[in-house]
Structures are given as C-alpha cells and as structure tokens.
C-alpha cells in the first residue's frame, strides 16, 4: 500500500479527527496556545535620580516583585539616569525608548512643573506618556537636625541664623516646598545641592547642612533615629505627621496659598511610573495590573513597613486627573508661579 493511500482519510474518519482535534483546541487553556508577551524579555526601569534615595529605593523594591506578578516572568533591571531634576530620564522615555513595554520611566514627581513652566531642555508632554500610575502618595516635610535649638516652625521664623538645607536640585518637589516657605513664610534659608537624597542625609550626619525638605517616608527612618525633627508639612498627610502645621494654613498671601496648593497636587503622584507614548493598550493593561498587584503583595507590604516606606497604588486615571488640575491654571498664575519654582 502506498504511503499516500495508507494515510488517506475517508469523510467519516476526517470528521472524527476534526472533532477530536477541535475539542482539544477548544479546551486548551489560552495561555498554552501562545507564550506570554513578556516571556524571555527584560524590562528596564530608568530611575531619574542617583542610587540610594527614595525614588531609587522604591524602584529596587518593586524590581524584586514585578517578575512575580507579570505573566512570563521577565527579568527586571534598574538603570539610574540622574540629571536636570529627572528631565534627562523623562526625555529618554518620551523620545528614545521603544513603545514596547520594555522600558519604564521612574522620574521625580516634579516633572509636570518642568513642562508647565516651559523649562529649557524639556522634550516631553507628561499628558501623553502611557501612565502606569504611582506607587505612593508622598507627603513633604521640612526636618532639621535634632541638635539644633529649633523645636517648632515658629522658632525657625524667628531665627537670626540662616538655615542651610540640602536638596537634589531646584526641580525636586520638596526643594520647591522649602523655596515657597522662604518666599511666603519668611524662612531664612539657603539651599545646597547634592547628587541624591542619600548624599543629603550623609551631609546632615556630617553637620554640613542643617536639614532638608523631603518626602516623609524618606525622612521617617532618620526621625525615628533622632537625627532630625520635622517642623512643618505640605497638605498631604501620612500617619505620624498629622499634628504638624500645614504650609497652606499658615500663609495669608492669597497667591502663596495657590502656589502651595499647586505644588502639593504633585504629591498625589509621589512615585510616578510611565511608559513611552503609543505603548499598546494590551501591554499597558499588563503593566498596570502587575503594579497594582505588587503594591497589594503581602511580602512587599512587609518589606516596605520594615524599610519604613509607604506604598499605595495610584491609578493611571487618577494621575491624569492630577495633571489636569496642574495644567488648567490661568496663564497669569503660571507666570507668577515661575518666579519661585525653578529648574
């Protein structure tokens, strides 16, 4: 019998074969029909600051859990790209990274203001990023060394000695917080810039500077150690700082209140994560779901509590709502805001 004849199927046999095969296809789980998109791939998170600070620590903590929650279990790596208050990193994600979900940006939360104020070098539109969301609501506080005689913010206002504060650059939201305190609440201070918030804290340890404004979650370990004492905060609050005076409540100048409110809006996107524009919706759904699951992961929550880092998932939609609040300000308000907020 020829090979051709040997394997020839009659109509009845053919239908039986198709029925069996069709049932096999019908009842095969979808995930076995095609490999997950991220299988065998590497995701790079580009952090817009140097190693050691709050943004970097958050990204490295997420790195250890994202692989677990993304189908296909991709490798996740961190790349630090400090410079120009995260503008360099933001430009890279917007213009150079492929929209394939393999490059994620973790810039500072102040980048919307760099765009709002038309800062030189800005080559992005924050409203057109594919937003993943934010991993925290970050409250800002001003803290000074505990060995200094200042017990309250009123003590600082009455001080004859200039306060030397450390920061990572004028585009940092917490630095802008301190600048507005200087302009509208009479804080006598001078700012010195360092490569990262870790370097700022080292400078405080060495008594090179008197304190810093920073996110409360980043300051808390040093508050608990007794190194620094918090004296005033922004509008957003976290457990442990509820009793601190709020900058907006102390200001009598109407414009000052508006500017402080604008700045504090960015705290709702305290740890932003974005992908390049035009990243496919199905890929963005994977990333958003993974980030939301990571933040709820009991192991991550335990680690974040151990490291005294607050985590909270803020959805892409909520981030866009914050951006809408920032960008709908009248031109005259934005123009005057630019006198105080620099990059």
Where are these regions (language model features)?
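Ligand-binding pocket segment of bilobal, Venus flytrap-like solute-binding proteins
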Residues: 82, 166-249
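N-terminal secretory signal peptides
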Residues: 1-33
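Short, polar/charged alpha-helical segment
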Residues: 52-72, 175-183, 222
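Short, well-ordered beta-strand elements
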Residues: 41-50, 76-77, 104, 162-167
